[in-house]
Amino acid sequence: MPKKVVTLGEIMLRLSTPDYKRFVQADTFDVTYGGGEANVAAAICNYGENGTFVTKVPNNPIGQSAINHLRRYGVDTQYIARGGDRLGIYFLETGASMRASQVVYDRAGASIADVDISEFDFDKILEGADWFHTTGITPALSDKAAALTMAALKAAKAKGITTSIDLNYRKKLWSKEKAQQVMSELCQFVDVCIGNEEDADTTLGFK
């Protein structure tokens, strides 16, 4: 029987320049969707397991397009909440030769940042789950998103489900002090913590 892995996080609209063009050269963008936790759910499905993704997207065609993108990979999207104002966007300029890639984020006011715990029934979402995964990006989005992450981790631990988190510190989203305050609490409910030495130091104070 396939294993069930539940992931929680943000899915974003990615607009990338074609043919290695710079932002200032491009007059069109290629469109796709992605996010750390969403990508994990898709990868799980590619391995023949059950990947379930939990998030909140706007109740409009862009939100539906993001859901349709996930479904193409076989991701279970039935627990995605609808509402809020918008989907977060990031712009990608793919590097060439010695020129590095550049990313510009436009995610303020995204639906997942204005989420409410009452929109999700984690007892139902986690039923039959073998693993729960999230990242440090999700709680960094807002206090509401951090509370949702905590609720999910607590529910998973109460059910005896293995939990994991990728620290993935982003200084543009929150300060080192805020990250340590929130992540130290979240990691009390985490079995597997993923991160490099720098992220462990920044978010947990481990050297």
Regions found by a protein language model. Name each.
Residues 1-76, 116:
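Glycine-rich phosphate/adenosyl-contacting loop at the front of the ribokinase-like
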Residues 26-28, 53-54, 107-109, 139-140, ...:
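Short, contiguous strand/loop micro-motifs
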Residues 7-8, 79, 105, 164-165, ...:
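General beta-strand structural signal in soluble alpha/beta enzymes
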Residues 11, 84, 109, 169-171, ...:
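Glycine-rich beta-alpha junction loops
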Residues 137-207:
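Conserved beta-alpha-beta core of the PfkB/ribokinase-like small-molecule kinase fold
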